[in-house]
Amino acid sequence: MANKKIRIRLKAYEHRTLDTAAEKIVETATRTGATVAGPVPLPTERSLYTIIRATHKYKDSREQFEMRTHKRLIDIVNPTQKTVDALMKLDLPSGVNVEIKL
C-alpha cells in the first residue's frame, strides 16, 4: 500500500467521546508504523429548533433546543497492511460515526 492515504472522518454529538475515538485511532496507527496527520477539528455543525411550549395558544412562549455535531479529520499516510488490519479490529466508543476513504 505504498503512496496511499487513508482519510478518516469522525462525527459525534459529544466532543469527549469523539476525542477518545480519535486518540485511539492515532495511537493504533502510530503503533503499527504509519504516519498520522491530525486529528484536525472541523467546524461544528449547529442545529437550532424552536418549538411553541403550549399546545394551542401562547405563541410568545417558546422553547429552543440545540444539537451540535462535532467533527474531526485524521489522515493516515503510507499505511501498512498491519495498520489496516489493526484499524479494522479497533473497538471505538458508541455514538461516533466513522467514514473511511482510501
Swiss-Prot record:
It comes from Streptococcus uberis (strain ATCC BAA-854 / 0140J). Keywords: Ribonucleoprotein, Ribosomal protein. This is Small ribosomal subunit protein uS10. Pfam families: Ribosomal_S10 (PF00338). One of its GO terms (molecular function) is tRNA binding. Part of the 30S ribosomal subunit. The keyword ATP-binding does not apply. It comes from the Bacteria.
